[in-house]
Amino acid sequence: MRITAITAAGLRGATPEGGWQEELRQDDVVHTLVAVHTDEGLVGVGSVFTTEDLVRGALDVLRPLLLGANALEPERTSERLHRTTFWMGRGGSITHAISGVDTALWDLLGQATGQPVGRLLGGRYRDRVRPYASLLMDQPDALRDHLTALRAEGWTAFKIGWGPFGRVDERLDERIVAAARDAVGPDAMLMVDAGGSDSAWSQGYKWALRTARMLDAYGVAWFEEPLPPDAIEDYTHLRRRSPVPISGGEVLTRRQAFQPWIEGGALDIVQPDVTKVGGTSELRRIAWSAHDHGVKLVPHGWNTAVGLATDLQLASALPDTDLVEYVTGSPYIDDLTTDRWTLDADGMLPIPDGPGLGITLDRERLARYCDVDVLLGSAS
């Protein structure tokens, strides 16, 4: 089976807010879907966390290396792409685009063999996983109402992030966390994401340590990105002294960037994003390195349905990954596939067991947000 085309289409029209200093608009493209087409009619899909123009520019570089190549060798092919483009540097648009291509190739391999990607990655440790509802922080009363509604829908784990946290004063920070814990109850998992990768983030180590102690009083399961993303020494000191686990890593790409964080003990929980880290192949390598060093991996996933499906397959194949991020209220997750995502009675999400990623894109729904004919070809 040979690769005949690689296409891309950005999602627009329902882009959710990101909590960033320069806030997103609904027509901004931050998620781009990639499709790899083959001479046997199979099409694999992947998701990339960047703009359509950057993905298409990167594919112009990568396409000559892909056309005519074996479509059933994802890891070898992706590593060849990384090595051939080494002179452009690690990370950036090339790595982001390779992320989508790599996952699309895994999807193809699964379709061709009739197996879910998780089994091809080494075997399924679980057939369902706990998703945590991920949402932006708000003023305490509004946040309480939002979380109460999600709790009523069956969610049992929650992450609140960004918003005014760490950006106004510490009294408001505690009021926000107290309102969240009150809403979700004493037994639910509650995580806090400070959003330290924000370009305007100004807090440092001493704030992070004080805040970690406050979060411990509310039973917070982890404290995410409390520091700027390059402050590895401060992260290492914080992890040693914090009473709550420290997580981060969503802005890093390629396994080499994660190595000093994992080996140096800077994080309790590492959070690569499969849609920009280098793809499924790269995230799996990072996961096993983390496992060998006693670091848990929970993938970052401000995501699409394709990205979520990828995270689910990875969660099935990694022994320590028992949580996945689920961005609540995003049509790019809830409205792209023929089968809707549904929590079971325990608040768990079943991991698709069909071939490949185990999902089918709904052309009619997808057409609301991108040029589906460009991505998947004209419907026959």
Tell me the role of every PLM-derived stretch:
Residues 1-33, 51-55, 63, 67-71, ...:
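Motif-centric detector for short Cys/His coordination patterns
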Residues 1-15, 25-26, 31, 39, ...:
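Flexible C-terminal active-site loop/helix
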Residues 3, 41, 62, 101, ...:
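Conserved, mostly hydrophobic/aromatic
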Residues 37-112:
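Metal- or metallocofactor-binding catalytic centers and their adjacent structured scaffolds
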Residues 46, 133, 159-160, 191, ...:
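Short catalytic-loop micro-motif centered on adjacent basic/acidic residues
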Residues 57, 219, 230-247, 252-348:
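Shared catalytic-loop signature of beta/alpha-barrel
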Residues 93, 102-142:
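Glycine-rich, aromatic-flanked loop segments that form ligand/cofactor-binding clefts
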Residues 128-237, 241-242:
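Metal-dependent enolase-superfamily TIM-barrel catalytic cores that perform enediolate-based chemistry
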